Amino acid sequence: MLILAKINEIGDMMGLMIYNSLTNKIEEFKTHEPGIVNMYVCGPTVYDYIHIGNARPVIFYDMLKNYLEYIGYKVNYASNITDVDDKIINKALEQGVSEEEIAKKYEDAYFKNCNDLGSKRPTFVPHATAYIKEMLDFIGQLVNKGYAYEVNGDVYFRVNHLDSYGVLSNQVQEELQNGVRKDVDTKKENPLDFVLWKKTNVGIKWPSIYGPGRPGWHTECVCMIDKIFNHKMIDIHGGGMDLKFPHHENEIAQAKAMYGNTLASYWMHVGRLNLKGQKMSKSLGNVILVNDFKTQEDLMSLRLLIVTQPYRNSISYDEELFNQYKKEYDKFTRAYKNAMLALDYNNYKSNEVIKEDKEAFINYMNQDLNCQNVMSLASSLLKELNSATRAGNLDVIAKKANMIKQIMDVFGVMMPYTPLNDETRKIYNEWLQAKSVKNFEEADKLRAVLTEAGVI
């Protein structure tokens, strides 16, 4: 396998272990195809700008993809756009525009936010509205199998036909039924039954044998996964913890009914990001938008904060925590720039790292993506880098700076440095000269020029 070949270069190490929400265990990660990871993550419903709670899964799964690629996997990463939903329709009606206009506006804003946060575009970005035919075919097959039924133009999934329903949320049907209001939808055979096709004459709709309507949210992802990954069970299905039930539970139910499997081998869930201990939610009005972060420094500080928290736990976000990580990011970027400047000025080029540093990084990451310990490792490397920079030890500077850069590349945290050119090299020499003769006024002016150029 590609991954084993790459890991064996740096020694005999433990393989990647990840927590599987389906089994509630930390398990060794094994793919269906050697060296290839097929991964799907539930994307946004595009009706508004995303807040930093929405951004947490975006950042985490981008980091996961980075790490899988770092250890040698080819990653086929799909994340959808839900571009048909009651919220989109309601906003379109309020503003007197089409659903397509609303969806396009907020999808564009979403990908700009992703890019600003350092998250790369997934390999596949399926749109729900492009798979209506597949969804109707899928629903029809479930009806034929007896797993779904139609009532006056609505189609529901028949939950009690699956003994395994509740496998992801670790609840039995009787317990789940006790928590459901009995008056939600009197057309259902069972309060837990969920909609596959919704009859409607309002907003965007499609013709079907059941009458005009649109698909249920839970069906969209199953059909897109099946189509994109060519009817194969995928390796990882991810999303936020809030999607575990009912959305992901209902995806598994449909996959069990149709294919006899759980859709993915590993189900991963990212904890919530709370604001001062309270759930961040547009409906509560206590949101901080990604758009509120105006500079690359602030965006990367936010990313560093998110990526270094235990991913399955909630984050209690406040300004004090953000400022702490802003200082951390500033420490790393300043040290990295100083190190790269020393190497650049002396024309010292090397891509080497210290074997033990790389082993420590991979061992921590292989422990269910323990980025907290990786951050501690990076802080130790930073101290060693600063010492080497002060001593002018170019070999150690290069190895420590390269390792920090590799870690931050996996984290998706940008480490900016602008290499010297003829002009900035000349200014840098003048700055060193001004400092040596204690012409501090001139030195400050030259430093400002170098800072503006991104050199220091």
Give the ranges of each region predicted by the language model:
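N-terminal, positively charged nucleic-acid-binding surface of large information/translation enzymes
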Residues: 23-26, 32-118
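The substrate-binding groove and active-site-proximal loops of carbohydrate-active enzymes
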Residues: 93-98, 124-129, 240
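Alpha-helix C-terminal capping/helix-coil junction sites
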Residues: 69, 115, 143-144, 268, ...
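Short, glycine/charge-rich beta-strand/loop segments that flank catalytic centers
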Residues: 81-85, 107-110, 120-135, 153-162
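Structural preference for alpha-helix termini/caps and helix-kink/transition segments
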Residues: 279-281, 287-456
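Short phosphate-binding/catalytic loops that engage adenosine nucleotides
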Residues: 73, 147, 455
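Alpha-helical recognition segments enriched in aromatics with Gly/Pro capping
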Residues: 5-45, 62, 112, 133-340
